[in-house]
Amino acid sequence: LTGKEKNIEADFIFSTVQTISKEDVFKSFNDTHFDEIIIDEVHRAGADSYLRLMDYFKPTFYLGMTASPDRTDSFNIYELFNNNIVYEVRLKEAMENSLLCPFHYFGISDLEVDGKVIDELSEFSNLVSNERVEHIISKINYYGYSGDRVKGLVFCSSKQEAKVLSEEFNARGYNTTSLTGEDSQERREQEIAKLVANNGDMLDYIFTVDIFNEGVDIPEVNQVIMLRPTQSSIVFIQQLGRGLRKSANKDFVVIIDFIANYKNNFLIPVALSGDNSYDKDTVRKFLSQGTRYIPGMSTIHFDEISKQRIYSAIDNVKLNTWLFVTDEYNKLKNKLGRIPTYSDFENYDAIDVRKIFEVAGSYYSFLTKKEKQFKYSGKLTKTAENMLNFVSTNLILSKKI
């Protein structure tokens, strides 16, 4: 279905949500017209347009597909499908099964400008200074790419940074452009076509902020450059994933992450490892031995300054706050559709249950505070609860469950 094509009698109908969510379009079908409905990028299904369609249509079978089911806005996607997870594959498993292109990740230190390390509060002039531009170009040339020519995506921290850096690259002989949410879909497709072309009007790089985090498929990308702070492990993997599609004449993708003095730097090893336990010792170990944990030919390397910046972020971050722990708990609860058991935290690679002990004393105490519907046969006396808290915090915390 498109704005011009309305062949509603076809056996298979493909449509964007923008088109089919229009009332005059979806109501041209009976609510039981479709036997099966497949929704791609289903993590967006919390939007009114998706919910309107799912409320209307009553197919025999709904299938949702997404690379990031755990949304950053806490909407429970799993609940839309009765918590029925047919198949789940994470980065490590995908690499083990050769579903993705091998990658070489380089975490390198971003530049100090006038003796100051770039961070979230850095002045814009420092982000686009000649010194930083030359530093970026030097590193991307050094680490290279696979293929006859570079076809790169550059993720920036703001629209203005993307625009100015693109101009600076062009002034130095590169052919680049910047794309933001303000650009039409037509222009985006035109620029992507130039990026993947092997002759004629070609682009070396597209500078952007977040419009390519999801919903775009450019297998030819052979270099991904990260020039922004890591806000979440979900976004990190989304941006990393832009280069992981297999393509002819691409043996691997190069990921170059410019690591400044960002407070969320600890999320980088968390995202790469896929370890959601948030155990600080585990995160530190991955930082020095990351390549050992990634299957196949992929490699992970951090330079010494980047390591120190990430170690510092690990030391400073508080992973035992009530807000953080309840957020991670809710992710697992949403996936299961019920209150998790002890073993669920390990079986589903969720947060280390010891983090819960640290904030609440014991899992029992946590649930009595967090879950109104939590019922335990024979409520513990205060003395018994205190004893359980003592065992949890003093004995169990001394070793991994």
Language model segments and positions:
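Conserved helix/coil segment N-terminal to the catalytic DExD/H
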Residues: 3-36, 47-52
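Conserved segment of the helicase C-terminal RecA-like domain
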Residues: 233-238, 242-276
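Conserved helicase ATPase core of P-loop NTP-dependent helicases/translocases
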Residues: 1-9, 25, 163-165, 174-212
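Conserved interdomain linker/interface between the two RecA-like ATPase lobes of SF2 helicase motors
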Residues: 85-156
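Structural recognition of the conserved hydrophobic beta-strand(s) that form the central parallel beta-sheet
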Residues: 13-16, 60-67, 205-206
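Long, largely alpha-helical accessory region at the distal end of helicase-like NTP-driven motors
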Residues: 147, 158, 268-400
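A short beta-strand element within the Helicase C-terminal
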Residues: 204-229, 235-238, 242, 253-258
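Post-DEXD/H (motif II) to motif III coupling segment of the RecA-like Helicase ATP-binding lobe
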Residues: 36, 43-105
